[in-house]
Design a protein with these regions (language model features):
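Conserved glycine-rich cofactor-binding loop
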Residues: 12-14
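Conserved glycine-rich Rossmann-like NAD(P)H-binding loop of the short-chain dehydrogenase/reductase
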Residues: 28-42
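Catalytic loop of short-chain dehydrogenase/reductase
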Residues: 133-171, 183, 237
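C-terminal substrate-recognition "lid" of short-chain dehydrogenase/reductases
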Residues: 209-233, 238
């Protein structure tokens, strides 16, 4: 089966845009959420519609519940019902236990965990049949915890748990799975040199191809016997076992 009525958060750029391209085509309807990337969202909409999809743009700040409600209302008015939700939008800022503040904590939890939970709840009320999917884009770091990016890591660990528990709650009508990417696209804080150093430190010593993440989304949608699973696509980053004391290095 294929998803035909799709909502993607953070769908205008990076991994979200790649997933939108993968899932679009004739007889497909997509609601693409964006926050600040209006021009990129509009350009992507034109490209996807050129190849036969119907695309609706939904602007919103996922840290605000009223914006989430607006996105759902727009999606319901345009799509009538849903069969696929991709919770991709994410906030990724650095803090530590020693210096985090309420603003950082609440924003990470709101965008990375609360918003997917609310969207999951509303999605479950607007489906038909037994072949519906939710895909959560998480992070490989949930499998190998560190004290860095404290609020982000806690929020993504919560999204991992949401994936498992909602798979239990929403079966058999909705399958819920997750993808935990590794180094795929350089973030704004990284130099090319730092990003290369990051992916060369993985066991497979390679950058993750975003198309592999898109293929995994498509695989989960078409696999009717899989739910509650989280797949690491990370060049083995979550398997890294070497530490300075083991290697005898400073």
């Amino acid at each position: 089966m294929e998803a035909r009525k799709i909502i993607i958060t953070g769908g205008a750029t990076r991994i979200g845009a790649a997933i939108a391209k993968k899932l679009s085509g004739p007889n497909k309807e997509l609601v693409l959420h964006f926050n600040k990337s209006k021009s990129k969202a509009e350009n992507l909409k034109k490209k996807l519609e050129y190849y036969g999809a119907k695309v609706y743009l939904a602007k919103g700040d996922l840290s605000k519940e009223k914006d989430i409600i607006k996105i759902i209302k727009l999606a319901k008015s345009k799509l009538k019902y849903f069969d696929c939700l991709v919770n991709n939008a994410s906030l990724f800022e650095n803090d530590k236990l020693e210096n985090f503040n309420n603003k950082s904590w609440e924003k990470h939890i709101s965008i990375n965990l609360k918003a997917p939970a609310l969207l999951t709840k509303e999605f479950s009320k607007n489906i038909r049949g037994n072949d519906n999917n939710i895909i959560n884009i998480i992070d490989q770091r949930i499998f190998k915890l560190t004290p860095y990016f404290f609020s982000y890591t806690i929020s993504k660990s919560g999204l991992y748990t949401l994936t498992k528990t909602s798979a239990m709650s929403l079966s058999p009508k909705i399958r819920v799975n997750g993808i935990a990417p590794g180094p795929t696209i350089k973030n704004q804080r990284q130099t090319e040199k730092h990003f290369k150093k990051q992916y060369l430190a993985t066991p497979l010593k390679r950058q993750v191809d975003v198309n592999e993440i898109c293929n995994a989304v498509d695989f989960f949608i078409k696999s009717r016997s899989i739910t509650g699973q989280v797949l690491a696509i990370d060049s083995g980053q979550s398997l890294n076992w070497q530490t300075p004391d083991v290697l005898g290095k400073e």
